[in-house]
Each structure stands twice: as C-alpha cells, then as structure tokens.
C-alpha cells in the first residue's frame, strides 16, 4: 500500500521557511542557540522572553508609590519652621530684655500677639508650599556668597570698622559707659566678629584654622594688655580715657591685621611665634656672649695683675729656665 503524502504547504510557504531559517538579521546578528535543559533559557530575540520579563519601570523601583525624589513632608515642614523659630527667638529675647514678655498684656497686646501668630502660620504654610523654590534660592545665594567670600570679608571688615568708630565715639562722648573696660569689650566684639566671618565667608574646612587664628590673636591681645597694664600698675600709674582709647585702637588694628594676614597666609602667627622665640634666643645668646667676653676681659685683667705681683727674682729664674 503506497502512502501518497501530499504536503498542504505551497511552494511559496516553503520558500518563506527556507528564508526564515537561513536568513540573518543584520541588526540582531546570529540567533543564540536554544538549550532546552536550562529553565527559562529562551533566545534573546524571543517575543515570549520580552513579554515574560518586562524591564523594570519607575513604579516598580518605587514600591511606595512616590514618583519624585522630593523630601518627605515632615522634613519640609521642619526646615520651613526653622527660620520662623529663629525670628521668634530674637523677638522673645528682646521682649525679655525689656521685661515685657507676657507682662501686663491688655486687649491691644493680645490682638497684636494673635495677629503675629497668624502671620507666622501663614509664613509656615507659604514656606512649606514653596519649599523647593526658597531652598533653591538660599542655595544659590550661599554659593554666590561663597564665590565672593574675599570681597565679603573686606565689606564686613569695613562695616565693622565703622561700627567700632561709632562705638568709640559714643564712649568718648559719655553716652556709653564701659567703666574703663574698652579694651576688653573690643576684644570680645572682635571675637564675635571673627566667629561670624569665619562661619559665613570662609569655607567650613578652614573654620578650625579661623578659630585657631582668632584665639592666637586674642592671646596676643591679652599678653599685650597684661604687659602694659601690669607695668603701669607696678609704677603706680593708671590709664586715663585717652590711654584706654589709644590702647584699644592699637589692639583693634593689630588684631585685624594679624587675623587677615593669618587667613591669607596660613601659619603666619605660628611662624611669627617661632621667629619671636628665635629672636629672643638670639638676643639672650648675644647677651651671654657679651657676658662671656666681659668675663674673658676680666680674667685677662686678673692675669695681668697676678703677673705684676710676682717678685723680680722669680721672674728671672723663670726666664733662665
């Protein structure tokens, strides 16, 4: 019995199969071999592999459902609340200083207090709502100030010089009584200024160097003050207002100059201290050498006197020998 098998495929279909079996996709290259023993080892170009292993989407990477990288709401609220707290802290300090903090409040005062609370609440809402905007503005401003920190240091120093001149003028006119402690107030205010300048206009990695320079300058101030005032006290003298003004001005300008020089050239004060020690050592060594020279001269004179005391007969015996 002859089995006449007739293919239902047409010649066109067979040609298509030959083409699909032997043609190479120029973009994908050769098809990888399929290994049935490995689980899920489907060819790379298989549509089934694409459908069963879809690429990770943004939503899968963020399982919590958030679609942005913004800060959480509580952190935004806390950061927005910080400037309001600082502003209110200044107001509380001022009212406490005036002894008017929640003291003898009437209707007008309580109305003003309620209005202030409303303003703070609205400010908190606005700062929280526009968090990205104002934080970006603060960052841009901080970067701009950081880039012009040298110019800012000069501007702050000029403003501080004007403030000190006004302060000294008030002291001289008697409108501000510091009880002859002008030098100590100058040192204190200079220390506060150094701290502000070092924390605002100088990068944080130089903050320790700035504080170190400030302490060294204040140490120089203290040493000069102790030497001058101590020597005046030993002789029973005391500074008048003119003396305190001169001393305060001298220490103020020397302190500013030394601090700026230290910030521009790190280690200047340390080298100055070493140089001062070396100079003092050289001076003491010179004084010692002068003392030794004087001692040698004295020994020479003593030797000459001893030779003059020797009898003439002994000198003749020594010469014959």
Curated annotation (Swiss-Prot):
Do the record's keywords include Transmembrane helix? yes
The GO cellular component terms are: vacuolar membrane
A Pfam family of this chain: WTF
Q: Example GO biological process term?
A: meiotic drive
Alphabetic keyword roster: Membrane, Transmembrane, Transmembrane helix, Vacuole
Membrane-spanning intervals of the chain:
73-93, 110-130, 151-171, 188-208, 210-230, 243-263
Specify the protein's topology with respect to the membrane: Multi-pass membrane protein
Sorted alphabetically, which InterPro entries does this protein's record hold?
WTF
**Keyword Membrane in record:** yes
Where do the record's region annotations for Disordered lie?
29-68
Q: Where in the cell is it found?
A: Spore membrane; Vacuole membrane
Its quaternary organisation is: Homomer. Interacts with other proteins that exhibit high sequence similarity.
The record's comment on protein family reads: Belongs to the WTF family.
User: What's this chain's function?
Assistant: Acts as a suppressor component of the dual wtf meiotic drive system, and can suppress but not confer meiotic drive by compatible poisons. Wtf meiotic drive systems promote unequal transmission of alleles from the parental zygote to progeny spores by encoding a poison and an antidote from the same locus; the poison is trans-acting and forms toxic aggregates in all spores within an ascus, wherease the antidote is spore-specific and targets aggregates for degradation by the vacuole.
Tell me what this protein is called.
Answer: Meiotic drive suppressor wtf26
Look up and give the organism this protein is from.
Schizosaccharomyces kambucha (Fission yeast)
User: Per UniProt, what is the name of the gene that codes for the protein in this document?
Assistant: wtf26
